[in-house]
Amino acid sequence: DLITNSYTRGKPRHVTSWRNLKTRDVCDSLVEGRCIHNGCYCDRSAPHGNCCHTDGCTVAFWCPGTKWD
């Protein structure tokens, strides 16, 4: 059951919410309001919500940087 984003005409069709990410244990840890997962940290207030999924980042520009937990 992967969390994925599908794009149509450049717009995200589905984005998993922060609450759902935490519920599904996708985030390895939280550091200062950021999700740390597979070397990617994503701000909670990112434009379309959190960008972490089971493979790390869904869209690079949603992530301010990377950090291994």
Swiss-Prot record:
GO terms for cellular component: extracellular region. One of its GO terms (molecular function) is toxin activity. Keywords: Disulfide bond, Neurotoxin, Secreted, Toxin. Contains 4 disulfide bonds. It is found in: Secreted. Expressed by the venom duct. Residues 1-23 form a propeptide. The cysteine framework is XII (C-C-C-C-CC-C-C). This is Conotoxin Cal12.1p5. It comes from Californiconus californicus.
